[in-house]
């Protein structure tokens, strides 16, 4: 190779040639070593080299030819060449990416296409569609081990088919769940029926666990729970060797469903009634003997039908006609909802899901809720209706006890039962009678033939929409008929599950009778369901209670529906005794309502002036007259109170006995009391008082008079409380009513107290007398008590109090609102001490026991009631002895009456309740009485009837508190004494109630109320008379000072100035009289400036809301507005803003902040502000239901104008 030396020198020529090569080796000169090369050879070499250069120095990328190595290298290293190279690479990469993406897309498309093809292939492979998988239905299949955990509790033997022995395992698993999804998952909970031939059945009876397909079909446009429409059908793996095992559609709607066949021990529990049944029935049908697949399928179809219509809860006797209806297994108990439409007649056409759909999903809910008892009752009714022939004569009778008893009733399929079912699916046997299909009910054609059902069209090709519309139209008519028949029934619960839907369930006539009390059969079923859920297997009483509870819930759901008494009367045959009681109760109610109407008329005459105060009241009165009549004869609990009405219905039946007594007592007393409180009592029973209840009825929007009647009849404290409250509310101004109504649903009792407060303010003087009567009567019954609280307060208000009727209403409303929780509880307890157990009276069973109120009542309470009535006069005399009587007659004598009544009531309570009697004895201290007298005088002078009303209201408030007030409360002598031991333990709300009156030191007008209740209510006078509050007491600000804005200046003038109150009003707290407070509250000096400003507001609030004082106190405590006063310290001058922590925490919920807004100055204790001993508050938290803000429009909201406080004394 030639070696070139690059020599840069002058020897280089411009053309690159060397001039002279000197000393430079340029390679071999010649081959032969000759320094001189041939020219020709040399030229050849050069040419060749040039060609090589051209070939070697050509840039393809740039398409450039270089002849010299150096130039070529320079080009390759140039930016131009590099840039082109990058561009080329980028293009290449982009191209590669594009190609790859396209390839991937293509691959994906191919995969999708393959998937589609596979899907199509799979779909094509699926030759069989699950029944009900048509356009309306979507189905899924779940496999469940059939015999898993098979427990055969009851055996249903088909007497007709002796060959076949069905062993149904009923697994009663307590489930409130209404979802049947778990049923499919849980073979135990699911009703699994394994039908096996004799050959294989006995051997593999507990061994083989065949998979059963559960088809859960839901109408696409129906809001249905899984269990309601789920249809469980069995897939038979071995037709020859093994009887086709099928599982009844398993739903967790366990109900007391009994497969009624020839053997009385055979009972099939259907899980239809999830909520009601404590256990989902798992029934396994095995064919111990050679069992025809058809029969097994019939049973399964029946079971399925039962399961499917669990929503409907219709106890239809399913005649699964494996043997041409010979083996009709009435699963009515099991399947209250539906009957299996097997080629036999389908007795449960009324159970059809469509019917449910027409009624509402509520129906479904109620059906699920229906308990075994309800289903049993329905079955009994069904039998009674003779719509189904019962092969077992004892079947219908045993059905009622079927909850506990295993009743086998074989019902012959009947044509009348062969009505179109309303269920979305009907278990039917295929033409070969080998498979039980869940066939869409729309597609079923009922015939008079033995199979009675024909289905041929492919569900996928079936036009469900058109048929469903027609069916709904047809079904609605039967529903009306059923409703009519149901309405004839006494108990709402009688047919909780019965045919609410259509007459087509004549086979379900029993159910119709039971469940279709009202057109809202849904509501009835709901009631029944709830009841059933409460006691699926419990006795009839339990069922009744549950039904009432359920009725309340159902009533809520079916507010749009009105219950008539006949509807309510409808009760399941299972609850025949209840029905009888209900009938008696209803009869009693009718008589009672008549008497009440008369009394109401009298009271209305008395109250017309007051009721005329507001047009709304008059309107309410007019409506109430209608509502009252309707309510008396028709249970029309509308909306909010319907749930209460349900409970009240239970209570009404239970408490009717005790209530009639109280009514009679109240009648006699009413005559004495101008029948005012009695009217109110009766009205309260029916719907508070007509004047108020009518308004209240309207206001309550379906807290119908019937519901009120129910509550009253039931002697339900709550219902009464609601009624009274509604009455008060109606009597109150519409604004207050609206507030109360807003709170009505949430705090029926609280609002009730408020309403009472208003009414009492309106009619305080009248109520004074009535209330005295009422006190004696209230001992008889909660009703009387509540009514006393109700009207007497209105009456208690002196005629002069009518000057500020609205304010008193507000006051009472506030007081009641405050004390309402306590009042509710108190009323329950005070309900002639049934209340104490009438707290339990909330329980329907307790309500039933309410007849035995006195028995339930502690002996002290019973004595207390009697004593209250007797001691009312005695205590009046005592009051004359007590300084309370010193209250000048300036109070229009009503105050004296109130004092007398209050004292008597208090003393009665004291005597009744020895634990509190000590406090009561010490309660009427001379100083307190003097203060009370002064206060009373000033009230009379100022005609501060509102204040008087407040004291009157205070007893009601005290009553309210008594329910929640614990024994240990230092509170009211009457309260403590009157409260039974149980009552004494109640929350300090009672204290608040009592103390509100004490703190205000208003004339003890509330004595009337206290006397009226005669139970645990301490009259303001007695409270004030001793004024012996514990050394640590809480001042409770009244709730609605806004209401006081409307109060005339007169009222404010009556409010003590801080100095006057502090100087002249000193409470002596006798230590012996009152138990020492659990936690001493430090006295906080109250700024007089604050006193002047907030005292006005608070004072009016207190005056207007003694009844609501408890609720307000709780709210205030929650808001931290309570103030602690040393008993000996001047109230207003020394009351500082109480630290919120110092006061016991009252769970007032959102009300507290509204009552006591932060911007408000610390409330000053007005003369009438209740004083709550710390011991009372601390021992137990005051549990106030969350009071609606409307009820308490910010207790301490700053007053736009502060009326100068004038010395009260």
From Swiss-Prot:
Residues 380-401, 792-860 are annotated as: Disordered. One of its GO terms (cellular component) is dendritic shaft. InterPro entries: ZnF-G_patch_domain, Znf_C2H2_sf, Znf_C2H2_type. GO terms for molecular function: zinc ion binding. A zinc finger (C2H2-type) spans 57-81. This is Zinc finger protein 804A. The keyword Phosphoprotein does not apply. The gene is ZNF804A. SUPFAM superfamilies: beta-beta-alpha zinc fingers (SSF57667). Residues 807-819 have a biased composition (Basic residues). GO terms for biological process: positive regulation of dendritic spine maintenance; positive regulation of gene expression; positive regulation of neuron projection development; regulation of neuron projection development. It comes from Homo sapiens (Human). Keywords: Metal-binding, Zinc, Zinc-finger. Residues 380-394, 826-836, 848-860 have a biased composition (Basic and acidic residues).
């Amino acid at each position: 190779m030639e070696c070139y030396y690059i020599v840069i020198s002058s020897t280089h020529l411009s053309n690159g040639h060397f001039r002279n090569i000197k000393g430079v080796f340029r390679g071999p000169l010649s081959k032969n070593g000759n320094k001189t090369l041939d020219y020709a050879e040399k030229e050849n070499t050069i040419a060749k080299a040039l060609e090589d250069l051209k070939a070697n120095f050509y840039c393809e990328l740039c398409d450039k030819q270089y002849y010299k190595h150096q130039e070529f290298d320079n080009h390759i290293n140039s930016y131009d060449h590099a840039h082109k190279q990058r561009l080329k690479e980028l293009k290449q990469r982009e191209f590669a990416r594009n190609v790859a993406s396209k390839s991937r897309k293509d691959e994906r498309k191919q995969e999708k296409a393959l998937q589609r093809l596979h899907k199509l292939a799979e779909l094509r492979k699926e030759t069989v569609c699950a029944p009900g998988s048509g356009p309306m239905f979507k189905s899924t299949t779940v496999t469940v081990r059939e015999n898993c955990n098979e427990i055969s509790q009851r055996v249903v033997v088909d007497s007709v088919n002796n060959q076949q022995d069905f062993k149904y395992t009923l697994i009663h698993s307590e489930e409130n769940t209404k979802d049947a999804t778990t049923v499919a998952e849980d073979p135990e909970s699911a009703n699994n029926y394994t039908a096996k031939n004799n050959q294989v059945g006995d051997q593999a009876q507990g061994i083989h666990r065949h998979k059963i397909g559960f088809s859960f079909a839901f109408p696409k446009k129906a809001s249905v729970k899984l269990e309601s429409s789920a249809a469980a059908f069995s897939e038979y793996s071995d037709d020859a060797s093994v009887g086709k095992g099928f599982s009844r559609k398993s739903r967790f709607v366990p109900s007391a469903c009994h497969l009624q066949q020839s053997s009385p021990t055979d009972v099939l529990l259907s899980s239809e009634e999830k909520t009601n049944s404590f256990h989902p029935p798992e029934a396994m049908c095995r064919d111990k003997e050679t069992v025809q697949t058809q029969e097994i399928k019939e049973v399964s179809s029946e079971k399925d039908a039962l399961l499917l219509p669990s929503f409907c809860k219709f106890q239809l006797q399913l005649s699964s006609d494996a043997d041409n209806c010979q083996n009709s297994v009435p699963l009515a108990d099991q399947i209250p909802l539906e009957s299996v439409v097997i080629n036999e007649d389908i007795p449960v056409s009324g159970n059809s899901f469509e019917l449910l759909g027409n009624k509402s999903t509520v129906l479904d809910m109620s059906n699920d809720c229906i308990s075994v008892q309800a289903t049993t009752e329905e079955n009994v009714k069904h039998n009674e209706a003779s719509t189904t022939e019962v092969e077992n004569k004892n079947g219908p009778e045993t059905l009622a006890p079927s909850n506990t008893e295993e009743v086998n009733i074989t019902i012959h399929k009947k044509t009348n039962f062969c009505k179109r079912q309303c269920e979305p699916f009907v278990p039917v046997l295929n033409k070969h009678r080998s498979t039980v299909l869940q066939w869409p009910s729309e597609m079923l054609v009922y015939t008079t033939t033995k199979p009675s059902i024909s289905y041929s069209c492919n569900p996928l090709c079936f036009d469900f929409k058109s048929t469903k519309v027609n069916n709904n139209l047809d079904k609605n008519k039967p529903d009306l008929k059923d409703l009519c028949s149901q309405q004839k029934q006494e108990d709402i619960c009688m047919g909780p599950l019965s045919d609410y839907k259509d007459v087509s369930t004549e086979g379900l006539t029993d159910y119709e009778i039971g469940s279709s009390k009202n057109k809202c059969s849904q509501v009835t079923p709901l009631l029944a369901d709830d009841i059933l859920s409460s006691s699926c297997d419990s006795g009839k009483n339990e069922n009744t209670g549950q039904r009432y509870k359920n009725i309340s819930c159902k009533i809520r759901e079916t507010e749009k529906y009105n219950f008539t008494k006949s509807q309510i009367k409808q009760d399941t045959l299972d609850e025949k005794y209840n029905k009888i009681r209900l009938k008696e109760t209803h009869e009693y109610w009718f008589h009672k309502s008549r008497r009440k109407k008369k009394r109401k008329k009298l009271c209305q005459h008395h109250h017309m002036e007051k009721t005329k105060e507001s047009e709304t009241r008059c309107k309410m009165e007019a409506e109430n007259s209608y509502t009252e009549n309707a309510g008396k004869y028709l249970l029309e609990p509308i909306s909010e109170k319907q749930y209460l009405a349900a409970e009240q219905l239970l209570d009404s039946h239970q408490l009717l006995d005790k209530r009639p007594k109280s009514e009679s007592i109240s009648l006699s007393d009413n005559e004495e009391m101008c029948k005012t409180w009695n009217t109110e009592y009766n009205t309260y029973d029916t719907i508070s008082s007509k004047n108020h209840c009518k308004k209240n009825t309207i206001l309550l929007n379906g807290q119908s008079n019937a519901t009120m009647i129910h509550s009253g009849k039931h002697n339900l404290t709550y219902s009464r409380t609601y009624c009274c409250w509604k009455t008060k509310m109606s009597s109150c101004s519409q604004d207050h009513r609206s507030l109360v109504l807003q709170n009505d649903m949430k705090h029926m009792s609280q609002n009730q107290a408020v309403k009472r407060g208003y009414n009492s303010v309106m009619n305080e003087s009248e109520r004074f007398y009535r209330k005295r009567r009422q006190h004696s009567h209230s001992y008889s019954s909660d009703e009387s008590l509540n009514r006393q609280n109700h009207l007497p307060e209105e009456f208690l208000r002196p005629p002069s109090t009518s000057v500020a009727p609205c304010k008193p209403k507000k006051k009472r409303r506030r007081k009641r609102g405050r004390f309402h929780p306590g009042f509710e509880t108190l009323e329950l307890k005070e309900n002639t001490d049934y209340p104490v157990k009438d707290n339990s009276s909330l329980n329907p069973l307790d309500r039933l026991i309410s007849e035995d109120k006195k028995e339930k009542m502690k002996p002290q309470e019973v004595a207390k009631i009697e004593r209250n009535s007797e001691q009312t006069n005695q205590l009046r005399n005592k009051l004359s002895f007590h300084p309370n009587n010193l209250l000048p007659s300036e109070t229009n004598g009503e105050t004296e009456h109130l004092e007398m009544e209050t004292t008597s009531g208090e003393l009665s309570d004291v005597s009744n309740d020895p634990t509190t009697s000590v406090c009561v004895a010490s309660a009427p201290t001379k100083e307190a009485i003097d203060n009370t007298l002064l206060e009373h005088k000033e009230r009379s002078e100022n005609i501060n009837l509102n204040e008087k009303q407040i004291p009157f209201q205070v007893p009601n408030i005290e009553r309210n508190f008594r329910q929640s007030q614990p024994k240990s409360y230092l509170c009211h002598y009457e309260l403590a004494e009157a409260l039974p031991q149980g009552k004494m333990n109640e929350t300090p709300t009672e204290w608040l109630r009592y103390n509100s009156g004490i703190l205000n030191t208003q004339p003890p007008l509330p004595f009337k109320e206290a006397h009226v209740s005669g139970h645990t209510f301490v009259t303001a006078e007695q409270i004030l008379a001793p004024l012996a509050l514990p050394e640590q007491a809480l001042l409770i600000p009244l709730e609605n000072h806004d209401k006081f804005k409307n109060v005339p200046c007169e009222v404010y003038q009556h409010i003590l100035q801080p100095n006057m109150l502090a100087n002249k009003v000193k409470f002596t707290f006798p230590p012996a009289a009152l138990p020492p407070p659990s936690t001493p509250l430090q006295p906080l000096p109250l700024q007089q400036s604050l006193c002047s400003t907030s005292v006005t507001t608070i004072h009016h609030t207190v005056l207007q809301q003694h009844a609501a004082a408890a609720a307000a106190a709780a709210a205030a405590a929650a808001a931290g507005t309570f103030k602690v006063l040393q008993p000996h310290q001047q109230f207003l001058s020394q009351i500082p803003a109480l630290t919120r922590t110092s006061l016991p925490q009252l769970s007032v919920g959102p009300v507290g902040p509204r009552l006591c807004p932060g911007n408000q100055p610390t409330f000053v204790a007005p003369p009438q502000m209740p004083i709550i001993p710390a011991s009372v508050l601390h021992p137990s938290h005051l549990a106030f239901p969350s009071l609606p803000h409307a009820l308490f429009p910010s207790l301490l909201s700053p007053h736009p104008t502060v009326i100068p406080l004038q010395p009260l004394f």
